[in-house]
Regions:
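Hydrophobic, Leu/Ile/Phe/Ala-enriched alpha-helical segments that form helix-helix packing faces
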Residues: 59, 63-66, 109-111, 278-294, ...
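Short, well-ordered strand-loop elements centered on a beta-strand within folded domains, enriched
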Residues: 10, 99-128, 152-155, 303-319, ...
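Conserved P-loop NTP-binding catalytic core
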Residues: 42-43, 56-114
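Extended helical coiled-coil dimerization/tether regions that scaffold
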Residues: 254-329, 436, 445-448, 452-465
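Short, surface-exposed beta-strand/loop "edge" segments at domain boundaries and coil↔beta transitions
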Residues: 19-20, 94-103, 125-138, 305, ...
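Broad, structure-driven detector of short, well-ordered beta-strand segments within folded domains
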Residues: 100-111, 131, 137-140, 293-299
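Electropositive, glycine-dotted interaction segments
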Residues: 112-288
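Switch/communication elements of ASCE P-loop NTPase nucleotide-binding domains
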Residues: 1-68, 73, 310-453, 460
Length: 465
């Protein structure tokens, strides 16, 4: 079954980096609006080191697992230092003309000598009746460390074993591989053929078990885009440009392509076609954001790729009037916009696209930043989650679309109390200064102590005590 819309509803974290516990709800889910008629924007604000980037990291981990890929080798470093496990639970809305329900995917990372592995996974489903969520029903649960039966409930275990003659052996092998590779068991390539045989429909929702698996996996591959701070860091190095791509109907399209800024790039012919289409799409918007600017592709002819496929050698140029310059010499802000514009266009036009961007404001002029967010909020269709330090968006978008980090690791994310009047920016600064919210928003720093610390640091540098 193909769903008309899939959207992220909420994210809840336990012991992820410096977040002991925190929950974020998308604006639509918070007011039980699942229509998908308009965009949802969620901005995350707070002081440095308060847990903003942790949300983006958790979404990246979820995307890796749902698409069957391994977690990064340093995954163990994302588990809080005082804990052995970190947990992330994401809720999604799956809707069609006939029905709509919420599916929760929860995964647990366990610290290990080689980093971390996925110790537990759980899929559950909740029906939506008159805007209210029914109690959660467990669809399947995996426990990597269980002895004997490691899938629950027992009815699902029996169903899976009955689907193939050698299912028990194949499941045991898949479990070992997933632990070693730090990948998902439920969404791995090894278990997909086994679970595809479990087509018994859920009695309450009338939905086949297999359909939910394939829907979440396809959504993570084609609809969920995560842009980390490493993305901006790569641009700042001026050696390459990470170009985030979205291409409808092609689950083989790479999420991100690294284009060299110091020499022409070589890409396979099929990927190059996508680059050409993307550049045409980018030019429709780029000339409005940066007047009189467009991109142009200069081809240098066919060239075989390192893996032996037919490819094209090309370079992307920045064009302003009659002047053409290599993209390397454009400003960091322009390169940042170019690198993520394709997926922002997709988010604007597709209700089932969710874009998560860390440090969205990096290198972008604050007035332009506010205008982009306002347009995406007012007339877009998809979802955007972003972190930022620039306070201009607080004046431009609806207050319900902003959450703030707190100094309490047990309750890391909150929305501001609406009392007190004034725009959100003024209320936020006032709350930092005099309090008045449910949680403290800022760990106080004394300006005199900061000045004294700078003086002491200078003496240390001079070798004086």
């Amino acid at each position: 079954m193909k769903y008309d819309i899939i959207r992220l509803m909420s994210a809840e974290l336990w012991n992820f980096k410096n977040v002991a516990h925190g929950k974020l709800e998308m604006p639509g889910a918070a007011c039980r609006d699942f229509s998908g008629d308009r965009s949802e924007i969620l901005g995350i604000y707070g002081q440095n080191g308060s847990g903003k980037t942790t949300v983006i990291d958790a979404l990246y981990f979820a995307k890796q697992l749902l698409t069957g890929h391994a977690l990064p080798s340093d995954a163990g470093d994302y588990i809080a230092k005082n804990a052995e496990e970190a947990v992330c639970a994401l809720s999604f809305y799956l809707g069609s003309q006939d029905t709509g329900f919420a599916v929760s995917y929860e995964f647990t990372l366990h610290r290990a000598s080689h980093g971390a592995y996925v110790a537990r996974e759980r899929l559950s489903r909740r029906m939506i009746l008159e805007g209210k969520l029914s109690p959660a029903k467990r669809l399947i649960e995996y426990d990597a460390n269980a002895e004997g039966r490691f899938l629950s409930p027992i009815s699902r275990w029996n169903e899976v074993l009955a689907s193939l003659p050698e299912a028990a052996v194949e499941l045991a092998v898949a479990r070992k591989l997933c632990i070693r590779n730090a990948s998902s068991f439920l969404f791995s390539a090894e278990t997909a053929p086994i679970f595809s045989g479990c087509c018994r429909k859920d009695a309450e929702s009338g939905e086949a078990f297999e359909n939910i698996f394939s829907a979440l996996s396809s959504y993570a591959a084609q609809g969920l885009f995560v842009i980390s701070s490493d993305h901006s860091g790569t641009i700042a190095l001026e050696a390459s440009l990470p170009l985030a791509l979205h291409f409808d109907g092609d689950d083989k399209t790479p999420d991100e392509m690294l284009l060299s800024l110091t020499e022409p790039s070589v890409q396979p012919s099929d990927t190059y076609k996508i680059v050409k289409i993307s550049v045409e799409s980018l030019n429709c918007v780029l000339g409005v954001l940066s007047p009189d600017m467009k991109l142009e592709i200069r081809e240098y002819g066919g060239q075989m790729t390192p893996d032996g496929r037919d490819g094209m050698r090309f370079e992307i140029l920045s064009v302003r009037g009659e002047n053409r310059i290599p993209l390397k010499y454009e400003s960091e802000g322009i390169k940042k916009l170019i690198s993520i514009l394709s997926i922002l266009i997709a988010m604007y036009n597709d209700a089932s696209v969710c874009v998560a961007v860390d440090e969205f404001d990096a290198g972008i002029y604050e007035y332009l930043l506010g205008e982009i967010l306002r347009i995406l909020e007012e007339s877009g269709r998809g979802q955007l989650i972003f972190t930022s330090h620039n306070l201009r968006p607080l004046e431009m978008i609806d207050p319900k679309n902003i959450v703030f980090t707190t100094t309490n690791p047990e309750n890391r994310y909150i929305r501001l109390d609406r009392s007190g009047g004034g725009n959100l920016r003024d209320r936020y600064i006032r709350s930092i200064s005099v309090g008045g919210q449910k949680e403290e928003l800022y760990g106080y720093t004394n300006p005199l102590e900061i000045a004294r610390a700078f003086r002491l640091a200078g003496r240390c540098g001079d070798g004086k005590s």
